[in-house]
């Protein structure tokens, strides 16, 4: 059985990147929450 995590920079950026987050209302909330919390890294 193969492992579930098969790293890919492209898929990582497309799914969890900043622009992907900003594309939806829920994603915008995530970014806002991470900003409020003072996270150094907002997205992948």
Swiss-Prot record:
What are the record's GO terms for cellular component?
ribonucleoprotein complex; ribosome
Q: Tell me the superkingdom of the source.
A: Bacteria
A Gene Ontology BP annotation from the UniProt entry:
translation
Any GO molecular function: structural constituent of ribosome
- Disulfide bonds, paired cysteine numbers: none
Q: Which Pfam families match?
A: Ribosomal_L34
Q: Identify the keywords attached in UniProt to this record, alphabetized.
A: Ribonucleoprotein, Ribosomal protein
Q: Which family does it belong to?
A: Belongs to the bacterial ribosomal protein bL34 family.
Q: What is this protein called?
A: Large ribosomal subunit protein bL34
Q: Which organism is it from?
A: Methylocella silvestris (strain DSM 15510 / CIP 108128 / LMG 27833 / NCIMB 13906 / BL2)
Q: What is the lineage of its organism?
A: Bacteria, Pseudomonadati, Pseudomonadota, Alphaproteobacteria, Hyphomicrobiales
Name of the gene encoding the protein in the UniProt record: rpmH
